[in-house]
Amino acid sequence: MCGIVGIAGVMPVNQSIYDALTVLQHRGQDAAGIITIDANNCFRLRKANGLVSDVFEARHMQRLQGNMGIGHVRYPTAGSSSASEAQPFYVNSPYGITLAHNGNLTNAHELRKKLFEEKRRHINTTSDSEILLNIFASELDNFRHYPLEADNIFAAIAATNRLIRGAYACVAMIIGHGMVAFRDPNGIRPLVLGKRDIDENRTEYMVASESVALDTLGFDFLRDVAPGEAIYITEEGQLFTRQCADNPVSNPCLFEYVYFARPDSFIDKISVYSARVNMGTKLGEKIAREWEDLDIDVVIPIPETSCDIALEIARILGKPYRQGFVKNRYVGRTFIMPGQQLRRKSVRRKLNANRAEFRDKNVLLVDDSIVRGTTSEQIIEMAREAGAKKVYLASAAPEIRFPNVYGIDMPSATELIAHGREVDEIRQIIGADGLIFQDLNDLIDAVRAENPDIQQFECSVFNGVYVTKDVDQGYLDFLDTLRNDDAKAVQRQNEVENLEMHNEG
């Protein structure tokens, strides 16, 4: 999962992009990058592994000159976690193009082969984002005149959409032209558009993964970029938009609302906060029906995503809500941390139990989801160590039984605790006295209540239905060989830093 931002401004954008990336940091903590276009029409790039605050020092910010730029925060879902695979990526032909991408291409392997054999384009990393950039560049290269018209750029994006499959929200810059952004025909990954009027004659535009980035910088939210839609903002600040997909349909990722997005964001006209409150209502009602005989003394969230959900469950059940865990905010999210051993070590550094809320009580813990089960098992153990008599666990999401192929790092089915297991078996493994999951239909209803115009969601991790209709068991097996924890351990041992000559080190 990644976060992207792009600003076409009339004033220097380096600080604004930095600030936007800090509020999108929850979408990826592995690497960060910013690239701008300076007054000489040259790219200025800084990218490296680490948090936004670690990657960009004052000397880097001073070099990132220009009124137009894009930024990216990354967690690696395709390729390795080497600094050379941090984004944005760059190609020098045609014109000079740079691109940042959130998502995952499901036909990256065949596209890499096509680019080399047919287009003579070499891909130097294992990142599908570099492949996507080169596909787009190759399509732009079909137009031999300069400068390109908006029609030409939209035609290149339409051709790109026909070639690539999967999930993608992208922002790019083309030297001598401006900034472009586009979203996949299923709208799986989020992308929003905003503007800020500087004065009567000057307007700045911004695209980002979540609306909270617009809010932070004082941009007015215009709308979500539609599935299959492309945005083009010229160097002069003129805005063009066009539908560039043949059969666009809205299939936003349901897991965005459960886990990834910030609660103060709106995605596809849905308040993430309100959706989570609705999840709490649905799950609370199910608990009241199915666990009416349980003696629950207190409802405690596993912070932070589940806090709003747990508060609503407590209201439905008529039980006290307490903050039983204190969170160290300087430790990354555990299920998107590379490697199972790192995740296990991280949980106890991340959370500490407040014994006063657990001692001699039957506690209902609430989490947003259960992925590998690593966190759940250790937190239940911590609750017992803190003196809880019984520990029940409620998940705001249904059982995650299938790999994700659209940009979330949980692809290996064998690493999912719910894969091939029933609820009671999962309960025994994690050591809970009781375990309950949200029903998928209830989860969909909870989110869709905020925008009834959305007819369906991308729910593959719950039901195994992949909306791009190109994912088979062979592809899932291929991903497993690349992305399971053992494979990633080998990748980390073999990685060699390659910062690239144009990187502002």
UniProtKB/Swiss-Prot annotation:
Gene name of this polypeptide: purF
Subunit and interaction comment: Homotetramer.
TM ranges: none
A matching Pfam family: Pribosyltran
E.C. no: 2.4.2.14
Binding site for Mg(2+): 305, 367-368
Gene3D superfamilies hit by this protein: 3.40.50.2020, Glutamine Phosphoribosylpyrophosphate, subunit 1, domain 1 (3.60.20.10)
Active site as annotated: 2 (nucleophile)
Free-text function comment from the UniProt entry: Catalyzes the formation of phosphoribosylamine from phosphoribosylpyrophosphate (PRPP) and glutamine. Can also use NH(3) in place of glutamine.
Gene Ontology biological process terms from the UniProt entry: 'de novo' IMP biosynthetic process; glutamine metabolic process; purine nucleobase biosynthetic process; purine nucleotide biosynthetic process
Originating species: Escherichia coli (strain K12)
Catalytic activity: 5-phospho-beta-D-ribosylamine + L-glutamate + diphosphate = 5-phospho-alpha-D-ribose 1-diphosphate + L-glutamine + H2O
The protein's name in its UniProt record: Amidophosphoribosyltransferase
UniProt note on regulation of activity: Inhibited by iodoacetamide and by the glutamine analogs chloroketone and DON.
Cofactor: Mg(2+)
GO cellular component terms, semicolon-separated: cytoplasm; cytosol
Keyword Transferase recorded: yes
